[in-house]
Amino acid sequence: MAKEFGRPQRVAQEMQKEIALILQREIKDPRLGMMTTVSGVEMSRDLAYAKVYVTFLNDKDEDAVKAGIKALQEASGFIRSLLGKAMRLRIVPELTFFYDNSLVEGMRMSNLVTSVVKHDEERRVNPDDSKED
């Protein structure tokens, strides 16, 4: 029977917390002037590689997002060394940062659903207007 919540998931969960603290307290890069949130971490089975998914507070500006991801990639060695001090791991994983747009997409989908529901209710209240379309 396979473990539902194995070691890679537990390490990823703890690593997410530690990276969030490191980004909040230790990283002083001006390109990361916007608030950075670690939305998830995926670990390889051998714990040698980690995909770190981040979101930014000001994610409307695509250039700022690209600059933020680039800054995180350049600081990944420093983050990795701090992570090695904070967590007891035999191998500190190689970090790769990705922008997580699921929050933005979720907001967009929610707005679409809200507008469709609003439009539907307007048509229900004024059925004469819909016949003219």
Swiss-Prot record:
Full protein name: 30S ribosome-binding factor
Domain notes: The C-terminus (residues 109-133) is required for stable association with the 30S ribosomal subunit in vitro.
Outcome of mutating G77D: Suppresses growth defects and restores maturation of the 30S subunit of an rsgA deletion. Decreased affinity for 30S ribosomes
Stated role: One of at least 4 proteins (Era, RbfA, RimM and RsgA/YjeQ) that assist in the late maturation steps of the functional core of the 30S subunit. Essential for efficient processing of pre-16S rRNA. Probably part of the 30S subunit prior to or during the final step in the processing of 16S free 30S ribosomal subunits. Probably interacts with the 5'-terminal helix region of 16S rRNA. Has affinity for free ribosomal 30S subunits but not for 70S ribosomes. Overexpression suppresses a cold-sensitive C23U 16S rRNA mutation.
Induction: Fairly strongly expressed in maxicells, part of the metY operon that extends to pnp (at protein level). Induced by cold shock (42 to 15 degrees Celsius) (at protein level).
Gene Ontology CC entries for this record: cytosol
Predominant place of localization: cytoplasm
NCBIfam families found in the cross-reference section: rbfA (TIGR00082)
Gene Ontology terms describing biological process: DNA damage response; maturation of SSU-rRNA; response to cold; ribosomal small subunit biogenesis; ribosome biogenesis
